Amino acid sequence: MSFGRDMELEHFDERDKAQRYSRGSRVNGLPSPTHSAHCSFYRTRTLQTLSSEKKAKKVRFYRNGDRYFKGIVYAISPDRFRSFEALLADLTRTLSDNVNLPQGVRTIYTIDGLKKISSLDQLVEGESYVCGSIEPFKKLEYTKNVNPNWSVNVKTTSASRAVSSLATAKGSPSEVRENKDFIRPKLVTIIRSGVKPRKAVRILLNKKTAHSFEQVLTDITDAIKLDSGVVKRLYTLDGKQVMCLQDFFGDDDIFIACGPEKFRYQDDFLLDESECRVVKSTSYTKIASSSRRSTTKSPGPSRRSKSPASTSSVNGTPGSQLSTPRSGKSPSPSPTSPGSLRKQRSSQHGGSSTSLASTKVCSSMDENDGPGEEVSEEGFQIPATITERYKVGRTIGDGNFAVVKECVERSTAREYALKIIKKSKCRGKEHMIQNEVSILRRVKHPNIVLLIEEMDVPTELYLVMELVKGGDLFDAITSTNKYTERDASGMLYNLASAIKYLHSLNIVHRDIKPENLLVYEHQDGSKSLKLGDFGLATIVDGPLYTVCGTPTYVAPEIIAETGYGLKVDIWAAGVITYILLCGFPPFRGSGDDQEVLFDQILMGQVDFPSPYWDNVSDSAKELITMMLLVDVDQRFSAVQVLEHPWVNDDGLPENEHQLSVAGKIKKHFNTGPKPNSTAAGVSVIATTALDKERQVFRRRRNQDVRSRYKAQPAPPELNSESEDYSPSSSETVRSPNSPF
């Protein structure tokens, strides 16, 4: 994958070339992640053909490996889904949650798993398909899947209940259904089995929520979210297995939920102090006696579970949810999502069924321990949940607060990077790491480095990250002999696409620079850029005042401290575009004195000196000017950048000149040789939010700095996202409250 001297960057010309010749040809929708050229569909067609193309195809989608999901019907039409990627994104919002497809929908299989669907044209009217992430296809009889009843008005036959049975119950379902006099309103606590501290949920059982034993187990599965799958067995604190619905309404109020694993932890049936605090508020009669037990009966051998068993800390504040979701999915599920259906019903306490999943008491970031753990050379005890799924190799990166290791998924042989953050080095700054990870959970885009999976244990935080092995943006330019405006345009297209996506989520990156733009090579040989390092990223819900970023790329409103928002990323992208076309930045300081640099940025005077810009098109210069406007309201947005002719190919010159920028980039920037093409990607992954704290850039207070901006009162205090930092001329920085 290394960049040879003969490598050409034509692969960055990824937009639809056909649109230069027929403006209406882009009917196949959004570009693919690599933005490869699409064929034009603009041909002479009959009205009958056009009508058939627009007709919606009704197909049913199932979740890979989910035997309890009945599927969801989609109407597929060109008007609703302009591309296959748009369908995948919509399916992710509908079908993905913390337990099911937590990494989103990335693959669609035929119902028999023999073929992968790669385009909308391959979907057949009336057929069924299976949605998966990166795991292999799991062969099940998906068309026979059944769900428990969510409405008290729906009758269920004993035959259908027998099919969906999750455990062997005493007596037939018909007997249980006929006699439900034992059901009375009762609040029970379900504790997930595994190492402590453990997650606990509180559930209300009554005639509206407890229709059958199978349905209660399914709702407990949704609430407790075992990593090992559905809840297979429930035990009382005495070690007695719950066999039927009536067992919930006995003397026991606390139950241990177990998955399909064969072995139990020896102390599964002992409650520690934190767990006792959670259940104490309901005055359970068995708590005191259970906490005094020295030994308990275990339904299985006293061995550590060989299956993954993530646990969560239990907090003593009943009724509060303390964790953020591990999955970066939309907080508001699609109306067709099973999860959203359950939430809608849970709010209807009057006459409809109530979901048990809505009665969660508390949760925390999952923690893991167990057998099969590996001890690395640095002394990290890698959890079994990680080692069972991934083969962890040697250390490939070492930062101030994180270590990066080779990581290969066992089932697919895909290479990832395992980022291990030592919590002892982050004491007092944990919220900074949590902010970075919470942003990574939310984002999923072809031009952004992905967080694949995370695991939180008491001493470390483990993040499985996408490993981009093609070097950074400067590596791509300096290692090629042929480089034109079209290549630079393609690179900006990738960057602007990522920025547009982030800004649609009200996320500002605040540290966009060439070192954080990595080159990803796709299987078809095409390449695209991926944006990484979200250490300074944050949610924008009002003006921000923290002075942070990298001086060369920092926007004037950040320096002026008048409050800033999303468009600081556009300024940084404009600076990068300028560098891509001439090899040096538009604003340059003198030596270590950053006063000159900051004054130039505040002035915002962009020049295109000769002879460096003589062969660059006027369209490119116009775009850069609009991206580097000091007036934020007049500055382009990410959408406007993508719509500009120079980016969408209409404004590119017919006779392109080769740009000689490699030498100037090496002169103006630190682009020394790297040990390999993977080094840049590893360096980005090894960086954490805490690393931004280690450099300081300051400036003398200039009372005239704010004169060109609208007067705004300074905030009484910085918001919580701004731990204050700073740098040297090319390093990422934050500054104190009064940095100048």
UniProtKB/Swiss-Prot annotation:
Q: Where Phosphothreonine occurs, residue numbers?
A: T46
Alphabetical GO biological process terms? axon extension; central nervous system development; endosomal transport; intracellular signal transduction; nervous system development; protein localization to nucleus; protein phosphorylation; response to virus
Composition-biased stretches (Basic and acidic residues): 697-707
Residue ranges under compositional bias (Polar residues)?
Answer: 347-362
Q: Which residues does this entry mark as bearing Phosphotyrosine?
A: Y520
Low complexity biased stretches: 297-313
| Role summary | Probable kinase that may be involved in a calcium-signaling pathway controlling neuronal migration in the developing brain. May also participate in functions of the mature nervous system.
The protein in question is named: Serine/threonine-protein kinase DCLK1
What species was this sequence derived from? Homo sapiens
